[in-house]
A protein has these predicted regions:
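Flexible, glycine/charged-enriched surface loops at secondary-structure junctions
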Residues: 104-109, 229, 266-271, 291-302, ...
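Short acidic-hydrophobic, aromatic-tinged amphipathic segments that line or gate anion-handling sites
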Residues: 3-8, 183-188, 308-313
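Conserved NAD(P)+-binding/catalytic subdomain of aldehyde/semialdehyde dehydrogenases
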Residues: 180-267
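C-terminal core of ALDH-fold dehydrogenases
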Residues: 323-433
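Conserved small-residue-rich beta-alpha loop and adjacent elements
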Residues: 109-174
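N-terminal Rossmann-like NAD(P)+-binding subdomain of aldehyde/semialdehyde dehydrogenases
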Residues: 1-125
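A conserved active-site cap/scaffold subdomain adjacent to cofactor or substrate pockets
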Residues: 232-304, 308
Length: 433
């Protein structure tokens, strides 16, 4: 059963700490297997991808068949109904518009010592996006990962997506087309991550890998980090709803279950100061669980990981929220803007009764790739910035070096780095321009 806590009870502190520290991810030790897969891909290249694809996805490939051809893409994309096509185009346009506003400016100035300083932003050259496969794969995730990369100016974007039994969701391919993806490969699992990181005869290596995946994909991303950049190791999805007496319990129940239906390890938490909201939401959840198409998953998630916390006021609610640092935070209250100003830890905030988290998964514009497992305390969601590098710039004249150089020489000598100091002092003593 879900956890029911009251912040006024004597054992609340202990119970809340247990809620925060509860482990929701499957503890599958796959590191050894993944290390072997990566090693074989490095050693055998395309052949390893072909062998693993036959083993796991039950399809026979050749090096020429690893990549989708233009005609194959066109054939699959034609299968997308007009309603879904229009919805995906709307989502893509809104995501692109939002992320264009994230592009930072370069800067250059001269300080009081005559030193010219600045920074310059430039995109990474190539990025790889992992897309979970099968007919149940999510085209929205393609948009959320690929569009920021293209907006940033990434010149080459490759996607790997497994096609078990040679099946693919056409919406995924349309999303890739709308996002400006350059290459799409029929490869999945840890072997796809290895191919993107180290390259094969067919797949060129990339500089950064993003995208969700199972335990094998997550382990592979950890192991190739350093060779390439990665976005994050995302855990199970989560939502926290802060609700007062003005909220709609029937809506809140659906919002909580919208996360619970993701997977059995997802977490949904409600914090409220209203006893009526507590009672009504509990009832509405039970009613909805009887009718959902994914009721088995949602019920297990809610029973194993769900929580309702009763608080005396929203000062306590905000304190608890900032400690939870949720991936998604809904403020279903009368004055959400006032509350939002006090929130310091959250991946994304959804303000007001008319802003369900689910709409943010698709069409509002902000990215839905967000920090989980309390990592919103120190990290942010995926953005254009994840595909940019900042290079600092500095230029000194002789006069500028004479002004600040002596301090640098002093510091170099204090650190015992003689040649550092000499490289500066020799210039200061020179009369050449």
């Amino acid at each position: 059963m879900p956890v029911f806590l009251n912040s006024s009870h004597s054992n609340f502190k202990k119970d809340f700490e247990m809620l925060l520290s509860s482990k929701r991810e499957d503890s599958i030790d796959v590191d050894i297997s993944v290390r072997e897969i990566i090693g074989l891909v490095k050693e055998q290249g395309d052949q390893a991808l072909i062998d693993y694809t036959k083993k796991f996805d039950r399809i026979e490939l050749t090096p020429e068949k690893l990549r989708f051809t233009e005609s194959e893409l066109a054939e699959q994309i034609l299968k997308v109904p007009e309603k879904e096509r229009s919805a995906l185009k709307l989502a893509a346009a809104r995501i692109e518009d939002y992320h264009k506003r994230q592009i930072p400016n370069n800067a250059f100035w001269t300080d009081e010592s005559g030193v010219e300083l600045g920074w310059r932003w430039s995109p990474i050259t190539a990025a790889g996006l992992y897309v979970p496969g099968g007919l149940a794969s999510y085209p929205s995730s393609v948009l959320m990962n690929a569009i920021p990369a293209k907006v940033a100016g990434v010149s080459r974007l490759a996607i790997t997506v497994p096609t078990p039994d040679d099946k693919i969701n056409p919406l995924v391919l349309l999303a890739a087309q709308l996002s400006g993806v350059d290459e799409i490969y029929r490869v999945g699992g840890a072997q796809a991550i290895a191919a993107l990181a180290y390259g094969t005869e067919t797949i060129k290596p990339v500089d950064k890998i993003t995208g969700p995946g199972n335990a094998f994909v997550a382990a592979a991303k950890r192991q190739v980090f350093g060779k390439v950049g990665i976005d994050m190791i995302a855990g199970p999805s989560e939502i926290l709803v802060l609700a007062d007496g003005t909220s709609r319990p029937d809506w809140i129940a659906l919002d909580l279950l919208s996360q619970a239906e993701h997977d059995e390890n997802a977490q949904s938490i409600l914090i409220t100061d209203s006893d009526d909201v507590v009672k009504s939401v509990r009832k509405k959840i039970e009613v909805n669980l009887k009718n959902l198409s994914r009721s088995e998953i949602a019920r297990k998630s809610w029973n194993d990981n769900g929580a309702i916390i009763k608080v005396p006021d929203f000062d306590v609610a905000i304190e608890l929220s900032n400690r939870i640092a949720p991936e998604h935070l809904e403020l279903c209250v009368s004055d959400p803007e006032k509350l939002a100003k006090r929130i310091t830890n959250a991946g994304a905030i959804f303000l007001g009764h008319w802003t369900p988290e689910a709409v943010g998964d698709y069409v509002t514009g902000p990215n839905h790739v967000l920090p989980t497992a309390r990592s919103a305390r120190f990290s942010s969601g995926l953005s254009v910035m994840d595909f940019l590098k900042r290079t600092t710039l500095a230029k000194l004249s002789r006069d500028a070096l004479l002004k600040i150089g002596p301090s640098a020489v002093t510091l170099a000598n204090s650190e015992g780095l003689e040649c550092h100091g000499l490289s500066i002092s020799e210039r200061m003593q020179s009369n050449s321009d």
